[in-house]
Design a protein with these regions (language model features):
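Post-HEXXH active-site segment of zinc metalloproteases
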Residues: 124, 140-181
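An active-site-proximal "capping" alpha-helix that borders the catalytic cofactor pocket
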Residues: 177-193
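Active-site scaffold of zinc-dependent metalloenzymes
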Residues: 54-125, 134-141, 145-148, 153-155
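Short amphipathic alpha-helical segments that mediate assembly, nucleic-acid/protein binding
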Residues: 9, 48, 52-55, 68, ...
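A conserved beta-strand element that flanks and buttresses the S-adenosyl-L-methionine
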Residues: 130
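N-terminal low-structure segments adjacent to metalloprotease catalytic domains
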Residues: 1-68, 123, 141, 145, ...
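Pan-zinc metallopeptidase signature
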Residues: 190-262
Length: 262
């Protein structure tokens, strides 16, 4: 049970890291056996470029000003813009990633480059990336535990079922990505606040605000709702975070629907 008299970050970190059984994890938290360091990572093709943000503003203005369903010409233009928004992507270096069954990889030169460009402390930014990836690891372990696959052989039916669920089935995959990144990035944002790394925390929010939901199921968009809830009621944000975590162990669709309500 969460104790709401504590500070927001302490509650979340305690229940994710030092008391993982409270969120469906085994009593003993097993750190990844593999923590790899590489120079540069592969490119992430999810984030939205400048043209996408401009198109979204135009589409939103159009929707706000007109009843597009009653105006065929404008409805067609709106549909064309919406379709184009789904195709707009740009490349950026990944700073870290978690791979199920393989562990965490941190791309040190990409992290160093990003920190230098913004004047951030390298160690602090590095640690924030690691926090994000560790939450992914803990989340994955929670899924394994839920399906009875913690410590199970990779050939076992339980393990295979957990793996299929973790990656999401067909259309669920995009929703699963949103839920995973929301849980990991919000914890990272809170960690930055606790450590006094406010410029990093603010930059994380700016990235989310700029991207918004230009691409349907944009993975980091869900953090906006939790952050807004935290601003009005840290306790409510704690409850929403814990609820989201629990829902994610049984249904990506329900967890994603909960994010949309924030």
């Amino acid at each position: 049970m969460l104790v709401y008299s504590k500070r927001m970050l302490e509650i979340i970190l305690e229940n994710i890291v030092t008391a993982p059984e409270g969120l469906g994890l085994p009593a003993v938290y097993a750190e990844s056996d593999v923590l790899l360091y590489r120079q540069y990572g592969r490119y992430d093709t999810v984030a939205v470029q400048r043209e996408g943000r401009q198109l979204l503003k135009r589409a939103e203005a159009l929707q706000a000003e007109y009843d597009i369903t009653a105006l065929p010409r404008l409805a067609k233009q709106y549909a064309e813009w919406s379709k184009k928004l789904q195709q707009l992507k740009f490349k950026r270096l990944l700073h870290g990633e978690f791979a199920a069954g393989k562990g965490i990889t941190l791309y040190v030169n990409a992290i160093r480059q990003e920190g230098a460009e913004h004047g951030w402390d390298y160690v602090a930014y590095y640690a924030s990336v690691l926090v994000h990836e560790r939450v992914h690891l803990l989340h994955y372990q929670a899924v394994l535990a839920h399906f009875g696959a913690a410590g199970a052989a990779v050939q076992s039916a339980e393990y295979k079922q957990a793996q299929r669920y973790w990656y999401g089935r067909q259309t669920e995959a995009a929703q699963a990505a949103v839920v995973k990144e929301t849980l990991a990035e919000f914890a990272r944002w809170l960690w930055c606040l606790q450590q006094g790394q406010h410029s990093i925390a603010q930059a994380l929010l700016q990235t989310i605000e700029e991207a918004r939901t230009c691409i349907p199921h944009y993975p980091y968009a869900g953090v906006r709702g939790l952050r807004a809830l935290h601003a009005s009621s840290p306790q409510a944000a704690v409850r929403a975070y814990s609820e989201l975590w629990q829902l994610s162990l049984t249904s990506w669709q329900q967890a994603y629907a909960r994010i949309k309500e924030l």
